[in-house]
């Protein structure tokens, strides 16, 4: 392996190339727009931020700029030409020595470069274009096709020109520049692919460590997953667009069938996978940014090491050459691994394309079935419309009948409420009648007791009369004896006469009291008889009224039951229901009250 002094001589260290890939879109309307870079331009050169103070002046002097002429004209004019720079020979093949006397050669190649419609500055990047998702060469849009590169100068050897197959994004067989270019992102194009391979080669070539190489391999694995998702998203977007294009306007809204449901499920799955694809793309862009920063930082550090003091330069050059040899070997292995992964991805892409074709055939068969079922569906819809009209008419009639039934039911409920009220009143009257009957019984018992008391008083009065008569007879006898005694001689018992008179007065007073009590009792008894007779008349009248109301309520209930039976049978659906709530008048004299 030769020394790396050629990297220091001249400005070849900064002469990084910009290789654009030609992308031709098959159907721009069938593809979805993905995220682009913010500037939409090719990145050119490395960042020249100096990490060490002593090498800053040298870095400023060794900077080199490449200008690319960009001519933006209207469509249909001649294609502007500008020179494309390539660093294909910068690293050489794995195992070939570097030549310190000869600088690396630039490989010119003609290709199409997609340019933004707003900016003309072009900068290279350290990434290589990836495979198109359709498995074939993508075609550029009409706007991007107007910008082309200048053809190679005639003095350059033809062996160094790149073949057109490189425009398809395939990796080189020799392993050189496997990760040195990136497809440009144009703001005017409708679809672009994200870069796939991270910048591992140049980083390892300028003294990269095994840790950095391992990080590059990890980034490559994640980018391979991103390419798989991109390839499946292409088929999904095409299928989704074919579903949208096959839809046609229809005058009658057809119900969703199971086939359309399956189509919608497939479209939903495709949309979910596209969302996962966008997430993978965002993560890939973050990793790409980190790798690009590491890629730009590594050459600067290598240059600072190479531009150090002279005594240490030889050892560092040897170490750098050994590291570059190891890096070239690792890169060769990585290229082989990437080629193997590329073949696997192509196989997966073919399987996905087959699956897409199968889904498209299923979709076409579903569409044919849909068109074949169209006339029968229209006939059934017409019949359904007729039946719906009949159903609406029947519903209207049913509503009218329901309103009538509701009115009758409300009337019946009102009558039931009235019946309940009258029954409550009757129960109250019955309770009142029972109370009056109980009071009447108690009065009768009291009357019997009073009669018995009156009879007893009468008996006592008779006894007192008899006693008074006996006492009067004795008094007369005593008076007669006293008169005889006066006539015959002095009185024998003059002290007994006042006592007998007092006793006589007392007995007379008691007799008067007894007579007064008897008169009062007889007048009370007479008053009680009159009150009892009045109460009896009232009770009899109330019983007659109660029986009359019972009979009227019974007749009304009979009529209501007949009306309910008629409503239940539906005989008088169109005839108005007449209910006589007053009832027939019963003569009051015909009611016979029960005896108390």
Swiss-Prot record:
Q: Where is the lipid attached (N-myristoyl glycine)?
A: 2
List cellular component terms (GO): cytoplasm; dendritic spine; glutamatergic synapse; plasma membrane; postsynaptic density
Task: Give positions of region: Disordered.
Answer: 136-193, 295-324
Q: Which residues form a coiled coil?
A: 256-374
**Which keywords fit this entry according to its UniProt record?**
Cell cycle, Cell membrane, Cell projection, Coiled coil, Cytoplasm, Lipoprotein, Membrane, Myristate, Phosphoprotein, Synapse, Tumor suppressor
InterPro entries for this protein: LZTS
Maturation and modification: Phosphorylated on serine residues. Hyperphosphorylated by the cAMP-dependent kinase PKA during cell-cycle progression.
Which biological process, per GO, is one annotated for this protein?
negative regulation of macroautophagy
Top-level taxon = Eukaryota
Tissue spec. comment: Highly expressed in testis, prostate, spleen, thymus, ovary and brain. Detected at lower levels in heart, placenta, small intestine, colon, liver, kidney, skeletal muscle and pancreas. Not detectable in primary tumors from breast and prostate and in many cancer cell lines.
Q: Where in the cell is it found?
A: Cytoplasm; Cell membrane; Cell projection, Dendritic spine; Postsynaptic density
Q: Which Pfam families does UniProt cross-reference here?
A: Fez1
Compositional bias (Low complexity) at which positions? 178-190
Q: Does the keyword Transport apply?
A: no
Keyword check for Membrane, yes or no: yes
Q: Where is the composition biased (Basic and acidic residues)?
A: 153-162, 295-310
Please classify the protein's predominant subcellular localization into one broad category: cytoplasm
Please state the pathology the record ties to this protein. Esophageal cancer: A malignancy of the esophagus. The most common types are esophageal squamous cell carcinoma and adenocarcinoma. Cancer of the esophagus remains a devastating disease because it is usually not detected until it has progressed to an advanced incurable stage.
Tell me its family.
Belongs to the LZTS family.
The UniProt record's further free-text remark is: Defects in LZTS1 are found in many types of tumors.
- Could you give the subunit structure recorded for this chain? Binds EEF1G, TLK2 and CDK1.
Q: What does this protein do?
A: Involved in the regulation of cell growth. May stabilize the active CDC2-cyclin B1 complex and thereby contribute to the regulation of the cell cycle and the prevention of uncontrolled cell proliferation. May act as a tumor suppressor.
Its name, as the record gives it, is Leucine zipper putative tumor suppressor 1
Source organism (scientific name)? Homo sapiens (Human)
């Amino acid at each position: 392996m030769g020394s790396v002094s050629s990297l220091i001589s001249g400005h070849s260290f900064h002469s990084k190339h910009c290789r654009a890939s030609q992308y031709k879109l098959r159907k721009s309307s069938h593809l979805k727009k993905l995220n682009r870079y913010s500037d939409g331009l090719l990145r050119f050169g490395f960042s020249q931020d100096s990490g060490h103070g002593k090498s800053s002046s040298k870095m400023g002097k060794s900077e080199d700029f490449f200008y690319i002429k960009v001519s933006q004209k209207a469509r249909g004019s001649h294609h502007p030409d500008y020179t494309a720079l390539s660093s294909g020979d910068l690293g050489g093949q794995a195992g070939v020595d570097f030549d310190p006397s000869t600088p690396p050669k630039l490989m010119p190649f003609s290709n199409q470069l997609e340019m933004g419609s707003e900016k003309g500055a072009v900068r290279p990047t350290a990434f290589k274009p990836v495979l198109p998702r359709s498995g074939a060469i993508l075609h550029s849009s009409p706007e991007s096709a107007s910008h082309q590169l200048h053809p190679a100068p005639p003095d350059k050897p033809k062996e160094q020109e790149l073949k057109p197959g490189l425009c398809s994004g395939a990796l080189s067989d020799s392993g050189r520049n496997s990760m040195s270019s990136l497809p440009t992102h144009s703001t005017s194009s409708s679809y672009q692919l994200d870069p796939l391979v991270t910048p591992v080669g140049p980083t390892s070539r300028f003294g990269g460590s095994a840790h950095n190489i391992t990080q590059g391999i990890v980034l490559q694995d994640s980018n391979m997953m991103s390419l798989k998702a991109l390839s499946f998203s292409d088929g999904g977007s095409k299928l989704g667009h074919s579903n949208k294009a096959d839809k046609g306007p229809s005058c009658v809204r057809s119900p969703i069938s199971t086939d359309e449901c399956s189509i919608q499920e497939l479209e939903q799955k495709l949309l979910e996978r596209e969302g996962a694809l966008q997430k993978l793309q965002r993560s890939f862009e973050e990793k790409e940014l980190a790798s690009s920063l590491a890629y730009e930082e590594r050459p600067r550090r290598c240059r600072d090491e190479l531009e150090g003091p002279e005594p240490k330069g030889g050892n560092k050059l040897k170490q750098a050459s050994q590291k570059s040899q190891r890096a070239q070997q690792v890169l060769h292995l990585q290229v082989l691994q990437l080629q193997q992964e590329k073949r696997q991805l192509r196989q997966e892409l073919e399987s996905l394309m087959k699956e897409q074709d199968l889904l498209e055939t299923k979709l076409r068969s579903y569409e044919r079935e849909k068109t074949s079922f169209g006339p029968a569906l229209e006939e059934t819809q017409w019949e359904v419309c007729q039946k719906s009209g009949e159903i609406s008419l029947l519903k209207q009639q049913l509503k009218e009948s329901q309103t009538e039934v509701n009115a009758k039911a409300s009337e019946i409920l009102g009558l039931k409420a009235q019946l309940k009220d009258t029954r409550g009143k009757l129960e109250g009257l019955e309770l009142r009648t029972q109370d009056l009957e109980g009071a009447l019984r108690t009065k009768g018992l009291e009357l019997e007791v009073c009669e018995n008391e009156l009879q007893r008083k009468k008996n006592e009065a008779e006894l007192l009369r008899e006693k008074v008569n006996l006492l009067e007879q004795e008094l007369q006898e005593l008076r007669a004896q006293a008169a005889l005694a006066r006539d015959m001689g002095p009185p024998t018992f003059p002290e007994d006469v006042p006592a007998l008179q007092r006793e006589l007065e007392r007995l007379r007073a008691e007799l008067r009291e007894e007579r007064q009590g008897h008169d009062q009792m007889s007048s009370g008894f007479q008053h009680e008889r009159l009150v009892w007779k009045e109460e009896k008349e009232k009770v009899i009248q109330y019983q007659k009224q109660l029986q009359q109301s019972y009979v009227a309520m019974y007749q009304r209930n009979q009529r209501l039951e007949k009306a309910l039976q008629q409503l239940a049978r539906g005989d008088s659906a169109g005839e108005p229901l007449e209910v006589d709530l007053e009832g027939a008048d019963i003569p009051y004299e015909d009611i016979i009250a029960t005896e108390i």
